[in-house]
Regions:
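Carbohydrate-associated surface elements
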Residues: 161, 182
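Conserved acidic donor-binding segment of nucleotide-sugar-dependent glycosyltransferases
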Residues: 313-325, 333-339
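Nucleotide-activated donor-binding/catalytic signature segment of Leloir-type glycosyltransferases, i.e.
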Residues: 241-261
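Aromatic "clamp/platform" in nucleotide-sugar-dependent glycosyltransferases that forms part
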Residues: 281
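Short hydrophobic beta-strand element within catalytic cores of glycosyltransferases
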Residues: 298-302, 312
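Conserved donor-binding/catalytic core segment of Leloir-type glycosyltransferases
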Residues: 156, 187-219, 231
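Membrane-proximal helix-turn-helix segments that form the acceptor-binding/catalytic region
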Residues: 133-155
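A short, well-ordered alpha-helix in the C-terminal region of glycosyltransferases
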Residues: 227, 340-354, 363-366
């Protein structure tokens, strides 16, 4: 990295509800820690504040990143404001407020530049995860309060779909830069594709991932593909309900719950799978799409999920569908058509290399540099373009 990088010696504080060591952590936390590592590589001093959990100590330094863990799933927001105000996170030059539905209200306790990182808008998720009044209050904060509070802040969205959704909430496009996820280098595993049809679902087991749709699809296809199996990789608070659902549907050996796997074992599943099913209600991007693509495994996903419209190139690296019956139909057609599946497999490999983490790190670093200089940036970090485009001066 250049010796005169503006980031050298600067302090950056991330406020996030989780980290990757949290049992409920997922792709959003992986994104955060990867771009944070990129800032460390460029000479910045980075602190990540997140909720406490049993899998990690209250404070530690990992790969140059300081982690401070306090509070619970809900109290983490108040604890984050308190820690920032008291100086427990140092004297940050830039604060990155990671808004997973709720913001940390950091603008109320700091005069430093704030960058708001958003993976997706939670309009559809609030009534699913928090039915009733709690969900309505959460959506009101995300829809009304946050855009007003951060009206002068820089935003980062992980997809164009998220950028468009933020625009619907009143966030001006000239303040939203798109910094996509990357894909890790391929994890070498052997064995090749399963000799019998196999579909995989990979991710946190929570209601909005709608794993039930994949279970229903595979069971509906059993008469046509008697050897078809579904392997479900991941864990989460909805896991027991999914086990019950599969049992009630008479899934038997057709549905296998693998639980949380090591990276090597997870990629072995990707390698063996004929197809990846991604029936999520919402995805800011869909990190698993690129991971599966590295192994030549195409994805079938819902178009309405948002970020899947960019991570899946419809008809080239996978198939996008519009409803649950469409998911079942697409899986059936691809399982039966080896030539089409092979064509999509080649496309999935190509697409998985379109965005790299190194590129995402430089693009995110460019946004932080702009914040330090009082500029706003917008546009997308398209391949071959190292910084988000269209710089503009900060709004008063």
């Amino acid at each position: 990295m250049p010796e005169d990088d503006l980031l050298r010696g600067k302090e950056v504080a991330f406020l996030s509800w989780r980290d990757t060591r949290n049992p409920e952590g997922g792709g959003a936390e992986r994104y955060l820690e990867t771009v944070a590592a990129g800032l460390v590589q460029r000479g910045a001093r980075v602190t990540v504040f997140c909720a406490a959990h049993a899998a990690a100590p209250p404070e530690e330094v990992v790969d140059g990143i300081r982690f401070v863990r306090r509070g619970t799933k809900l109290s983490v927001y108040a604890e984050g404001m308190r820690a920032l105000r008291r100086g427990d996170l140092g004297r940050p030059d830039v604060v990155v407020d990671v808004q997973n539905g709720l913001p940390f209200f950091s603008r109320l306790v700091t005069r430093r530049p704030v960058v708001v990182l958003v993976h997706h808008v939670h309009r559809e998720q609030w009534p699913v995860v928090y039915p009733g009044l709690t969900g309505r209050v959460g959506w009101f904060i995300e829809r009304r309060v946050a855009p007003l509070l951060y009206r002068r802040s820089q935003y980062v969205a992980v997809s164009q779909a998220t950028r468009d959704e933020l625009g619907e909430l009143g966030v001006r496009r000239r303040r939203v830069a798109v910094v996509h996820n990357g894909t890790d280098p391929v994890v070498p595993v052997g064995g090749g594709k399963s000799p019998t049809p196999m579909v995989a679902v990979v991710g946190r087991l929570v209601p909005h991932k709608r794993v039930e749709h994949a279970i229903d699809a595979v069971l509906a296809l059993q008469p046509t593909f008697p050897d078809l199996t579904l392997e479900v990789v991941g864990s989460g608070w909805w896991e027991a309900r999914l086990h019950d659902y599969a049992r009630e549907r008479g899934a038997g050996d057709a549905v296998v719950f693998r639980g949380h796997l090591s990276e090597a074992d997870k990629h072995e599943v990707y390698e063996r799978a004929w197809l990846l099913a991604l029936p999520s209600l919402k995805e800011g991007w869909g990190l698993v799409v690129g991971e599966a693509g590295m192994h030549g495994t195409p994805t079938v996903a819902y178009r309405e999920a948002g970020g899947t419209q960019e991570s899946v190139v419809d008809g080239f690296s996978g198939v996008l569908v519009d409803h649950q019956q469409g998911l079942t139909t697409a899986l059936a057609e691809l399982l039966a058509d080896e030539e089409r599946r092979a064509r999509l497999s080649r496309g999935a490999r190509v697409t998985s290399h379109a965005f790299t983490w190194e590129h995402a790190q430089e693009s995110f670093a460019a946004v932080v540099r702009a914040a330090l200089e009082g500029r706003r940036v917008s546009g997308q970090d398209t391949p071959g373009q190292d910084t988000p485009e269209q710089p503009d001066r900060a709004e008063p």
